[in-house]
Amino acid sequence: MEDVKLEFPSLPQCKEDAEEWTYPMRREMQEILPGLFLGPYSSAMKSKLPILQKHGITHIICIRQNIEANFIKPNFQQLFRYLVLDIADNPVENIIRFFPMTKEFIDGSLQMGGKVLVHGNAGISRSAAFVIAYIMETFGMKYRDAFAYVQERRFCINPNAGFVHQLQEYEAIYLAKLTIQMMSPLQIERSLSVHSGTTGSLKRTHEEEDDFGTMQVATAQNG
């Protein structure tokens, strides 16, 4: 594949006056990027409406599994736009398939001047994984760097081992996707031609080896 230079925006730096982390802060939401918040369900409960409005929240991503639907609910559907994802906090759960739609949802909100809260139950594993994935793809970061960036703002994050593995795999996936999107039709055609040419060369090499072997056998028989 031809080299394509990908360009990413600069990552916002940590605020110098950031609060020192304390245990009760895990029950609150934190602003990870300008306009992007991460927190537990307790930060999106009915009693927290004044706080959500104070921070200008307009969109909410609610991550839960089916058995949690009775108590983790989109409480303000008339006030905020919701994206509800049914995902279990299970290492074998496939979360990569949801990354494109969550990125589109967050990007759409931020582009129109809105603010997004991403929450699961505790705001530690599932929701943290999605915020990390968003930062990776938006700013061209590796998993470990995106994790560290989010943890500076919400210290208690701890995606399960299966989610970590998928996030590490996602780096190659999003880079390949963005590279193809940046390539012109001519570049794509050339890349395919190079690939086909390599395959053809290998095929010709094997055919030539077979022909040479046949010649050796014929020579031996005639001798």
UniProtKB/Swiss-Prot annotation:
Region: Disordered, residue numbers: 197-223
One Pfam family from the record: DSPc
Alphabetized Gene3D superfamilies for the sequence: Protein tyrosine phosphatase superfamily (3.90.190.10)
Keyword Phosphoprotein applies: yes
UniProt KW Membrane keyword: no
Location in the cell: Nucleus; Cytoplasm, Cytosol
SUPFAM superfamilies, per the entry: (Phosphotyrosine protein) phosphatases II
Interaction with FBXW7 (motif): residue ranges: 76-78
Listed GO MF terms: F-box domain binding
Phosphoserine carried by residues: S184, S193, S201
GO CC, any one term: nucleoplasm
InterPro entries to which the protein is assigned, alphabetical: Dual-sp_phosphatase_cat-dom, Prot-tyrosine_phosphatase-like, STYX-Interacting_Phosphatase, Tyr_Pase_dom, TYR_PHOSPHATASE_DUAL_dom
Assigned keywords, A-Z: Cytoplasm, Nucleus, Phosphoprotein
GO biological process: negative regulation of SCF-dependent proteasomal ubiquitin-dependent catabolic process; regulation of ERK1 and ERK2 cascade
Residue intervals of the Tyrosine-protein phosphatase domain: 28-176
Function per UniProt: Catalytically inactive phosphatase. Acts as a nuclear anchor for MAPK1/MAPK3 (ERK1/ERK2). Modulates cell-fate decisions and cell migration by spatiotemporal regulation of MAPK1/MAPK3 (ERK1/ERK2). By binding to the F-box of FBXW7, prevents the assembly of FBXW7 into the SCF E3 ubiquitin-protein ligase complex, and thereby inhibits degradation of its substrates. Plays a role in spermatogenesis.
Subunit structure: Interacts with MAPK1; independently of MAPK1 phosphorylation status. Interacts with CARHSP1/Crhsp-24. Interacts (via FQQ motif) with FBXW7 (via F-box domain); the interaction is direct and prevents FBXW7 interaction with SKP1, a component of the SCF(FBXW7) complex.
Family: Belongs to the protein-tyrosine phosphatase family. Non-receptor class subfamily.
UniProt name for this protein: Serine/threonine/tyrosine-interacting protein
Source organism of the structure: Pongo abelii
Gene this protein is translated from: STYX
